[in-house]
């Protein structure tokens, strides 16, 4: 019965869909997903019990569900690849390359220099991270002689 409840959990499905889009590397973290979905359900039930409307309770539950997940390394890398390497790596290459880049030690070390909070994308530090990631990706492509579309356009 518990397994069925987890499989049919609205908040679990909502979180899994979100992770699939923004944190594909975390989709299989079942312990995290289960705990967070349960916390969101508790927040929702508590809000309803306190007299909040269903839409208000949904907002409160979503805050719990997505806490710490608003800034995505995956989304940042896809953005860098799409914006800075549009000619060299046309769609769908950015989405396919990003999971590999997330595992790259040089890329990981760039991210490790920054405190990546939910609102990091709105800070001045974001531009520094973006620039550093762009340079790191250029180096990865050059050092490893990776093929790109229109390689002659690489700077």
What are these regions (language model features)?
Residues 1-155:
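C-terminal alpha-helical interaction appendages
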